[in-house]
């Protein structure tokens, strides 16, 4: 049964008024809580004829995220289209500079512009404006609108909205940037690395159910990061088993070293690149 009911609350009304003014819109859905919640809200508010949703298939997108989009689209009755944004044909993206996201989003929005007759919309929220987000420049270049930002919604507001929509699986979904963010700045983005990262993180999730996990490709080797509580609970046998799994997934990187550490946000990003 398709979910079509929406009950506006004092919390969601400002966002609804903004989206109603857009008329037809195309939403880029990554599989994360922000864009997925926005997609469900806009679709229930305006209907299938007014809202198109697009998901980019890419080695940088976890398989679980694509499956999540497909499942939600079926449950909600979305008008969903899968596309290849072509970022892997862009050498500027593959070089993995500090502003890699600019090139990724440029390719995405160029692709969406060719499909859309309405307004392009993203799931960017107000908290995102506090970070270094080169993708926002690409969005500005393509006249992409950010309804969460316009409504003053931060991440907590988005999670609250997901709960209001009866989507607890989204409200509890941890943040997870694209897989390319796990590769240290300056190391070329390779399909094999991203597939290995996805495999390792999926396996760790199934084995240890951590609150947070990142498999990072660094110049010094592979770094497995987990939230401190999960990491402290790993015994030597757990670490050995995990290391063996990592090496199996990264066979294309012979003699690589595997290390473990507590999760540190953005630790594959070399901020000094900004000064060069």
Question: Model regions: which residues?
Answer:
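Short secondary-structure junctions
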Residues: 204-211, 249-257
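Short, conserved beta-strand edge motifs with alternating hydrophobic and charged residues
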Residues: 120-123, 172, 178, 225
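Solvent-exposed beta-strand sheet faces enriched in polar/charged residues
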Residues: 54, 216, 225, 259-261
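A short, flexible beta-alpha/helix-coil linker loop
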Residues: 88-89, 184-186, 229-231
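Residues at or immediately flanking beta-strands
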Residues: 212-214, 221, 257-259
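ATP-dependent adenylation/nucleotidyltransferase module used to activate substrates
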Residues: 2-164, 222, 240-253, 264-276
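A short interface-forming secondary-structure element
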Residues: 219, 223-238
């Amino acid at each position: 049964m398709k979910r079509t009911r929406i009950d506006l609350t004092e919390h969601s009304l400002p966002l609804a008024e903004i989206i109603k003014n857009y008329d037809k819109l195309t939403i880029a859905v990554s599989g994360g809580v922000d864009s997925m919640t926005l997609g469900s809200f806009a679709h229930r508010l305006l209907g299938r004829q007014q809202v198109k949703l697009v998901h980019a298939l890419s080695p940088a997108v976890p398989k679980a995220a694509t499956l999540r989009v497909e499942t939600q689209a079926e449950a909600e009755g979305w008008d969903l289209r899968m596309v290849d944004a072509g970022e892997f044909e862009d050498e500027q993206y593959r070089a993995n500079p500090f502003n890699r996201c600019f090139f990724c989003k440029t390719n995405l929005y160029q692709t969406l512009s060719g499909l859309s007759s309405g307004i392009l919309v993203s799931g960017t929220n107000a908290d995102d404006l506090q970070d270094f987000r080169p993708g926002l420049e690409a969005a500005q270049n393509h006249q992409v609108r950010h309804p969460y930002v316009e409504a003053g919604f931060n991440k907590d507001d988005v999670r609250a909205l997901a709960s209001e929509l009866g989507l607890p699986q989204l409200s509890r979904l941890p943040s997870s940037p694209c897989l390319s963010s796990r590769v240290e700045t300056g190391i070329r983005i390779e399909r094999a690395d991203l597939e290995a990262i996805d495999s390792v993180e999926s396996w760790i999730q199934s084995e240890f159910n951590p609150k947070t996990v990142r498999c990072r490709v660094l110049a010094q080797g592979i770094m497995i990061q987990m939230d401190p509580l999960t990491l402290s609970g790993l015994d030597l046998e757990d670490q050995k088993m995990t290391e063996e799994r990592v090496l199996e997934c990264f066979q294309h990187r012979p003699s690589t070293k595997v290390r473990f550490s507590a999760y540190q946000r953005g630790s594959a990003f070399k901020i000094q690149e900004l000064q060069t």
